[in-house]
Structures are given as structure tokens and as C-alpha cells.
Amino acid sequence: YIDAKLIDFVDPEQLEWLKEDLKSTDKKCVLFSHQSIDTEMNNGDAVRRILESENERVGFKKVVIAFSGHNHSNYTKQINGIAYMQINSASYVWIGQPTQTEKRYPKEINDKYNLLRNSIPYDKPLYAIVTMDENEVKVQGSDAEFVSPTPKDLNLPDSLGGLPLVFSISDVVIPID
């Protein structure tokens, strides 16, 4: 048995480490996490408070952006002056329900890689190139196509759980104030 409240969670020791690590530098900071601090993390609000408090303490936008990728989606949003960017998966979008994968791959592949049953792969890997200078963070994304049957073929909506169902990583420019 696993307590679901302990999944997608930053423990108190890590929260304290983050707080102290941010205080220890006068440089701009970029965070990378698997789980989405803005939506999915059970105590994401506690993490965001640490980031926002550090920006308030120093009086400038020290914490610039937080990247994550767990949701296999693509979006950027601002919360209290900090950008949160969900970087799409390199190879597939997770649907969480059967996706007629038997139409994509032979039985032996589906049997060997059972996660394929609940996902829709891309025809080529996605990636992003991120550059940062004193004025901005620039993300140059990439795109692909869904391998058929596509979400549209499966009569799926454009988003699942509020997360865009896409085969791309968008180009984004985030100004650093």
C-alpha cells in the first residue's frame, strides 16, 4: 500500500534545503522538477511560497522559471511573478485509457511494453533548447505528429484534466524583470 498523499510531494527536509540553497546565492535561479509545482504536486503551494518568499526577500526576480515534465503536456503560466513551464514528453502523451495500440504495433511489442496501451506516441522525439541571458529565458521547442490512431481518431478532447493534448513543445520567451 502506498499513501497517495506521499506521491508528488516534497518532504520537509527538501523544502528546507531549497530555502537555504536559494538564500546562498545572489544569482538568478531556474528550477527543474519532475512533478509540476504549479498543479500536480501535493504540496506545490509550499514550494511556491518558498520561491515567492525568496523573490520578495531579495527584492528582484531571483527565481525566474520552474520547468517540469510529468504531465506530458505543453504550457507556460505565471504565478505570482514566476513562470512555470510544462515541457512535453520526448516520445508520447499519457492518456490513461486504452488507445487502440494494437493498430500501431504488433502484439509482441504491445505485450513487451504494456504502457503503450494507455499512451499515444509521437512519430519523432520532442526536445527543447533553453537559453538564458540577463534579459530573458528563451525556449525553442520542437514538434512532431501523433502516431495513428490519434486523439482525434479516438474522439478524445483537446485537453485531458485541463492539460493540452499536443505533440509539441512551444517556443516561449520569458522576460526577466
Where on the chain are the PLM-derived regions?
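Binuclear metal-dependent phosphoesterase catalytic core
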Residues: 74-177
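Surface-exposed beta-strand edges and their flanking turn/coil or helix-capping segments
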Residues: 3-6, 14-15, 44, 97-100, ...
